[in-house]
Amino acid sequence: MSVFGRAVMSAAAVAVGICVAGAAQAQELKPWTKGGFETHQYRSVFAEMGYPQAEVDAKLEAIFQEVFHGPDKVYFEVGDDMAYMSDVKNFDARTEGMSYGMMVAVQLDKKEEFDRLFRWAKKYMQYQDGPMKGYFAWSLAPDGTIRGRGPASDGELYFVTALVFASNRWGNDGDFNYLQEAQFILNSSWEKDGTDGIKPFIDKENHLITFTPDGRGVGYTDPSYHIPAFYEVWARWANDGRADFYRACAAASREYLHKSIDPNTGLNPDTNNFDGSFIENAFFGRRMKPAFRFDSWRVPMNIALDYSWACADREWQTNYANTIQNFFYSKGIDTFVDQYNVDGTDVDFAMPAGQGELRGTGTRHSVGLVATVAAATLAADHAIAREFVQRLWDSQNKPYEDGYFDAYYDGLLRLFAFMHLSGHYRVIEPAK
């Protein structure tokens, strides 16, 4: 049976603080009061909106096929048993995309795609020995040539979680022992003591993920790297003897997010210090105010994930979801742009994206941000959340008016958001 044939718990199927109505009848959208770790159930917000679950599942499968196998795909097979995810506009394969692809694949029970991606990542990206042992080079050319040799910590975060889920879903008796692969990353990181400037990708003292585990990046972080519920997955199933540490990481990450997000706008900077204070950044010689840019788009969806799975910070996360949706609504639900200063003012300089003829400049109403703000509905409790969900349902990932097109980042964030709001982004527990 495919993952779409398994029980999806919509408000029409289970009541967790929500009134039951007909399966295709629109309902009031209200966040659940318990998370998937406890209930083993996941909302289908689209079903609550009145869409039949079969139609929702078919649309999700179509979006998966678009991203992985369609004319504008970002998943490319290599030989008989490997594949990579490409940030096409930057002409590379990144640990971000590789680990995202693996997470999508394990969530949707696509074992072939998962194994192909991990086989490529292990062969070309992962260091098997030396100071970087266990880590992954963050950027490679499609032929496997390393472009950026250092790790980016969010890649390791997603690799570990996806591998633990693969172990739980498929077992460890095939080509890979997924659990051992996850433990290899975690154990290798834990053993690092600063030799050659390489440290653990999660700071042992403050329990917060680093921007990078090498160079200057060990001294600060990125709000979009913070997904507290992932640490709770590790605490339950990584089986490496560090469960208490991971639980402390989850708590520290939630506390850090409280300090990092503007209470009036719901916005955060792309990077900041561990205490939540701003870092003064420069780009192309320009001094820039702390701004919500491309990395930051992920934060609304990450907080929605933590709410959906753990529901451990309900009051703050619901207030956050309402605040950030209110901010973008105030900018025009169909016209808000994808970069703002944290205080909500317009940026003086728009960060470009892509390279060469695929480069995009300026700001736009990006579908990736439309998607992640809609995903925040899992935690929101106000009426306008429905409008954001509707915009996601009606969205398409296609070239913008200026010709810019991002099949990779926009495409993957849109896919993740559909997974969340269809009830198909779950804690994957061990098979019983």
Annotate each language-model stretch with its function.
Residues 1-6:
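N-terminal secretory signal peptides that target proteins for export/translocation
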Residues 20-26:
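Sec/Tat signal peptide C-region and signal peptidase I cleavage site
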Residues 45, 53-97, 105-127, 132-148:
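Internal amphipathic alpha-helical repeat/solenoid segments
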Residues 91-101, 145-170:
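Aromatic-rich carbohydrate-recognition surfaces in CAZymes
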Residues 101, 113-114, 175, 182, ...:
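Solenoid-repeat scaffolds in large eukaryotic assemblies
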Residues 306, 360-364, 372-383, 389-432:
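A cross-kingdom marker for long, charged
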